[in-house]
Regions:
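Helix-biased detector of long, well-ordered alpha-helical tracts
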Residues: 4-368
Length: 368
């Protein structure tokens, strides 16, 4: 760990002259959570990695692809640890920093935890970006951490070809209130906190087709902290949570299904969608990650033959800083919706239900 400003200053001192006002996205082959390694390839890579030590205090590790690690400290406290970083999804450096920080802290909220501390992860093409530009990225991240009530206490930086920014996030949660993605129960209803479509909007932005209103809508959703997860984690009827990010709604719901040894059904008509994203998706705008997501897990999805392609695009659309997906008892659904809506998530909706697996079919996801 190092002093961020000092390290970046020394990197800049040895760099060649930089371009004036470059677009951040021009350096990135992908953007936001859309630059994740495809889920199928990621499983193949991780299958080759040794498991390592699993101490008894480790409550949540890598076994169910959960959002964060959880380590029991004592009878009343567990440490939530996560990291998330990515390449630019937007050109404005301040907005890039805000989006990346919001996305990183979401993993703590998805476990029902309360953030306490962050470390910055910074990779920048020092020869290409002015110090003022890099500073604005850091300012954006710091503004979100102030909103979350936590400090950025340090970090690490490197000189790389593509801009990268994100956080290590640490939080606390009561061991009895950890909300895993593997604890859903048959009969649970599914509540989604944010509308889908951020990936489609980012694709339109990269093509130079997104207008100011569309950009503002995209920014509003991607910089909205999922702080409601702290309250949801205290509800007895909430059984499982995750946040919808790079693998899309279908991919992250399948992780809940597999971890819980269940299946799920989603009502397409109930899904909250970003209005302008629907327009672009109807016109065929999509990220490359959306197709890679479907290729990775489409065999485990029952998709209606008469459903249009644009709906599938939005169900596999990589969400950067997406919403919380909650699996809760039906009796708890009104309180869960109220918690979302009172926290500013106006489009939160019940979108489906968890159910037992059909005989010999394993965990599956059906859209209807």
């Amino acid at each position: 760990m190092e002093t961020m400003a000092g390290t970046i200053r020394s990197m800049i001192d040895t760099a060649t002259p930089f371009e004036e006002s470059p677009k951040l996205t021009q350096f990135a082959h992908g953007g936001g959570c859309g630059c994740k390694i495809a889920p199928g390839l990621l499983r193949e890579i991780l299958a080759r990695a040794p498991q390592g030590l699993v101490p008894p205090e480790l409550m949540v590790g890598t076994e169910t692809a959960d959002d964060a690690a959880v380590y029991r400290l004592n009878a009343t406290q567990a440490l939530v640890a996560t990291t998330d970083f990515f390449t630019p999804i937007v050109d404005d450096p301040y907005d890039f920093g805000r989006i990346a920080a919001t996305n990183a802290l979401s993993d703590i909220y998805a476990m029902g935890g309360t953030p306490i501390l962050a470390l910055a992860l910074v990779g920048m093409p020092i020869a290409k970006l002015a110090p003022e530009v890099i500073g604005r990225v850091l300012e954006g991240g710091a503004s979100v951490c102030r909103e979350a009530g936590i400090p950025i206490a340090g970090g690490h930086s490197i000189d790389v070809l593509e801009p990268i920014y994100g956080l290590v996030g640490l939080g606390l949660v009561h061991p009895d209130r950890v909300r895993r993605n593997a604890d859903a129960q048959a009969g649970d209803v599914l509540v989604l906190g944010k509308p889908l479509g951020v990936g489609v909007l980012s694709a339109a932005l990269k093509k130079g087709q997104l207008d100011g209103a569309g950009y503002a809508e995209m920014l509003r959703h991607t910089t909205q902290l999922n702080r409601v997860g702290m309250a949801l984690g205290q509800m007895d009827g909430v059984h499982a949570m995750t946040d919808v990010t790079g693998f899309g709604l279908a991919g992250h719901l399948l992780e809940i299904c597999r971890g819980s040894c269940l299946s799920a059904q989603v009502e397409l008509a109930s899904l909250p969608l970003i209005g302008s994203a629907v327009q672009w998706a109807r016109e065929g705008v999509a990220t490359g990650a959306s197709g890679r997501n479907w290729a990775a897990y489409g065999n485990d999805v029952d998709w209606p033959a008469d459903a249009p392609e644009w709906q599938r695009t939005l169900c596999t659309d990589p969400q950067t800083s997406g919403g919380l997906l909650v699996s809760c008892a039906a009796s708890a659904a009104p309180a869960v919706l109220q918690a979302f809506q009172s926290s500013g998530f106006a489009q939160a909706a019940v979108v489906g239900r968890m159910q037992a697996c059909e005989h010999d079919r394993g965990s599956r996801l059906a859209f209807a």
